[in-house]
Amino acid sequence: MRLLLVVANLLAIIALLLVGYSDLLQPEAWPKLSNVGLLMPAVILANLVFLVLWILLRPRLLWLPVAGLLLAFVPIRQYTPFNPTEEPPHGALKLLSWNVAMFEGYVTKEGEKSEMMRYLLDSDADFICLQEATDKGDSLSPLKLLRHKYAYTAFIPKASETGHGLFLASRYPILSHDSIPYHSPGNMSVDFLVDVGGQKVCIINNHLQSYGISEKEREDFHHILQGDVEADTARIETLQLIEKLSKGTTRRAAQVRMVAARIQQRLKEGLPVIACGDFNDTPISYTHRTLSKGLTDCYIASGNGPGRSFNRNGIYTRIDHILCSDFFKPYGAKVDDSIHTSDHYPIFCWLEMRPKP
């Protein structure tokens, strides 16, 4: 029995390492394996179970799960960081990013602001970056209300049937904006140049390719995880899901490289860079590793816990991110799960400007 447990523990450690470092795989070369980062919560949990088992059954073997967890410390911290609480200093900039799902949760009575709108207006953010925003044009439209509050705004629609796009509300002048050229019918990234007290800052707002999974497919996946589906059906649906995930990941990879090239260009120009938005990918992914090269993940540096930002069945991870260059020090990053008017939760943090001498 003990030998079986040891073997099972070793397999759990191997799975943790393979999943944890799967962000090294390029999606075009490894389309199916590059998605295993989605399993990170499951493999962490499995290794924690062995930690508890050895404490109870055989403390002398406690070193085995501890060694596995230490070997995977970096990806575990990427997935679920823990940081001491630090108050943001006076003058730090607050940035909020949110996929608002075309404001589908925006419901108002005559003359009344919705919960979604109150949240945005009360956020007191210096920068609000929205994805899947729509400009409805009526007197209570979200973007019109934000334009009343913020001196500088820009809405860049996507040329598609939905008419949604990316939006930036800023307390500081927006000098220019430039869409990053990659082919996609429903996704886009925009490079905004903002003047913050004489310092030019690049803010890249992103809505990258999704996995393309429908609500029903997410619910089916949730039932599979719970063991509520017959084995044959579960196998077929799982294979179909893996195929769909692979296609979405491969398409996203091409977009990611275009955005990463723009980030590196801006860094070479000596500009402070913030890249944020709906990356549609987890902290354990090619997307995250490629985009965060030369940048700091604000949530990993100053947030706590897994920070699940997509709130529908089956996806238990953070797919919305804020990255910054070393011109900034991040504080208090948080995924705010108190508001449920979109299929994403907003993510925000404070950024202290620290110009180089």
Language-model features: locations:
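Short, solvent-exposed loop/turn segments at secondary-structure junctions
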Residues: 101-103, 135, 172-174, 208-211, ...
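Active-site beta-strand/loop signature of hydrolases that rely on acidic residues for catalysis
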Residues: 94-100, 116-140, 156, 202-207, ...
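Acidic/histidine-rich helix-loop elements
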Residues: 97-113, 212-249
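Metal-dependent phosphoester-hydrolase catalytic domains
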Residues: 2-16, 21-54, 63-67, 178-180, ...
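Structured beta-strand-rich core segments of catalytic domains in phosphoester-bond hydrolases
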Residues: 65, 69-91, 107-108, 117, ...
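Structural motif corresponding to alpha-helix initiation and N-cap regions
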Residues: 30, 110-114, 140, 316
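N-terminal capping/interface segment
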Residues: 1-10, 129-137
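N-terminal targeting/secretion presequences
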Residues: 59-60
